[in-house]
Amino acid sequence: MLEATPLTEGWILRHEQGPLAAVVPGCVHTDLLAAGLIPDPFLGRNEAEVAWVGRREWTYEVDLPGVDAADGHDRTDLVFDGLDTAAEIRLDGRLLGSVRNMHRSYRFDITGMSGRLSVRFASAYAEAEAVRERLGDRPNAYPEPFQYIRKMACSFGWDWGPTLVTAGIWRPVRLERWSTARIARVRPLVTVDGTTGHVELLVDVERAAGETGLRLEARVGGVGAVAEVEGTSGVVRLEVPGVELWWPRGYGEQPLYQVELTLHSEGDVLDLWRRRVGFRSVELDRSADEHGTGFTLVVNGERLFARGVNWIPDDVFPSRITPGRYRARLTRAAEAGVDLVRIWGGGIYESEDFYDVCDELGLLVWQDFPFACAAYPEEQPLRGEVEAEARENVVRLMPHPSLVLWNGNNENLWGFRDWGWEERLAGESWGEGYYLGLLPRVVAESDPTRPYTAGSPWSGSWERHPNDPAHGTHHSWDVWNREDYAEYRANVPRFVAEFGWQAPPAYATLRRALPGEVLAPDSPGMLHHQKAEDGNGKLARGLARHFALPEADFDRWHYLTQVNQARAIAAGIEHWRSHWPVCAGTIVWQLNDCWPVTSWAAIDGDGREKPLYHELRRLYADRLLTLQVRDEGLVLAAVNQAGEAWDPAGVRLRRMSVQGVVVAEVTVSVSAAARTVAGVRVPHEVEPVEAKEFLVADGDGLRAVYFPVPDREVPYPQPEFDVEVGPGSVTVSARTLVRDLLLQADRLGTAARADTGLVTLLPGERVTIGVRGWEDVPGVEDVRRALYCVEPAR
């Protein structure tokens, strides 16, 4: 039987100042940080102080005693699941191999060898710049050479991330001892026909020597099957009756079946492969219709409006991301109503831990191939690396039922057409051959049960603009970059794969990241932790359209920018959800951060939720009431993504003044069948017509609020409310209109979390906000100082 021994102990890292203890899996930066040799690059402006690390060579070493004994096995292999990135591997001075791809695993036969194992990493900068020198400079979105090396692109910085180019053994390394043969690769093709599941295991084996007879045995769901190995391959087919379907979150359960495959020779078990699978079908409906070209995910025959978030690496040093951290982040996503996570193409092919959690939670996964915002050369050595990594990772991730879509790249097709690349490239390769040739071929050959799309955004044809909202996927970035979020209403894309609005992280996150700094939007540390081009300018212009800008009041600025972020995303999602099935999904940019930064994230780099996160819980709930401005006037839309019809017992519409007076009131009926949207025209008598008026819609425990003018024009009363504090709660009772009340619980204790975000209270209403994590129950005045709401323009 194959024996695997992890190599986690005894590693040292050699560098200019001598050896130091190393953690494997890990990376250079985290080892230097643990040794006290560099400051924390996440704090202050330390990022610049550690830039030298990416320009150096680094060597990891460990002794491998007794490898030559081999413990009676025919073979001993040294296996690396991930090396970041360009490295030479030597054992006892002998070169085992040279590698240059973070996204691949590597295996070396070291039978009969022992001694000092050395992994010497070249500077990723030096490697990338050498390739650029050889192949020629090509355009990208950031002035770094990230497209010339198969490494996580955002290591080189992004408009939300630091430039921290590291190196290291970033995924597990082990010794594998085996005899006769081992299971080298398994491609599980899992399909379902009614309630009958089909599992086809296409198996490759590696032989140590000879042509010994080999047999494969597989079991799943109480069903077994056997097949002989012919040469170095075999196929095992199983038919499993009465299977339960795996469904996305909110549509059904997520039953998982364990597949166990064993390799036998003359009665001995040589190797074991074990994975969990789920039985479900997935299609991507890209049919043409009167609105353009659709982009609708269909799972088990059910058409979905995808309630999505974009995912970036959760740490700029991915080796630090634990299984528990993956589970915490993804659980928070599921609790916010998310049912689809897009893994963005400037990061990595995500880990088994990530996908296991998605399988269990029913989170659909859209996996980008790692290409983003650049013209990628198709010449060697890069082309061979791209094909090898794609084939390996497609097969690695195939077992996971959560994986429903492969996407060729992020914004590169758009960049070629719109960002001046075509002229600059002048006929040089830029990645089109990957996205329209190599990658779809790899997916078709290896994973034919899943759809592939060439890129995001992509309209499906060069005959149309790549980012045409009427065809395929659309990235909506005119809003934020140039326009107000009210402009989301200008079109109805078929699928919105990116849109977003920035806000700073939680106050406690800022205080940890910028210790001792007098905080201001333009203070040195705040500017350093704002990576977007003209980011603060866009924040200011976005605020000015809606609010009177606070002067020299950082706390108000912090609150209002977070409110504006939540409102912007709400404007988009409510509009687009109300247009289902023409629009079939929204993927918010972005769920998470990789460090403390002002960004588009809903959960900041320290794991604290912004108000946007709590707003997503409302926006992505199965049922949503929304008031929408249409050509014919104001419309009340009932969005019902639940599996049962929704017939609220009358929706109460109140036209109110900001002083709390009900000017007019009616009750309307609206009924939405399962998975549909229904709308009703708001009667004229309850439409607000003055700046001092607004409309409230209440039905079935849900509320929608509509103000006809920006906040800066609304004559709000001075907010008045009473506060009660309990052991784990804060209750606020409104005496006036209180708009967008927010408890910033982290101001009361760095571990404190509130379970509620922005709440609008009418006079006489109250809300109880649950709080966990504070050490001592604070006083009422302390809580008042942590409560914020919209105030009259000053």
Model-identified regions with their sequence ranges:
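Alpha-helical packing segments of well-folded alpha/beta enzyme cores
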Residues: 56-63, 329, 333-336, 354, ...
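Aromatic- and acidic-residue-enriched segments that line the glycan-binding/catalytic groove
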Residues: 133-140, 357-364, 378-391, 421-429, ...
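Secreted/periplasmic carbohydrate-active enzymes, especially glycoside hydrolases
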Residues: 1-341, 470, 477, 578-579, ...
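Active-site neighborhood of glycoside hydrolase catalytic domains
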Residues: 376-464, 567, 607
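Substrate-binding cleft of carbohydrate-active enzyme catalytic domains
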Residues: 286-419
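Short, solvent-exposed turn/loop segments enriched in Gly/Ser/Thr/Pro and often Arg
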Residues: 81-84, 122, 278-280, 309-312, ...
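Flexible loop/turn segments at secondary-structure boundaries
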Residues: 86-87, 126-127, 285, 313-316, ...
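Substrate-binding clefts and catalytic carboxylate motifs of secreted carbohydrate-active enzymes
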Residues: 15, 168, 406, 441-444, ...
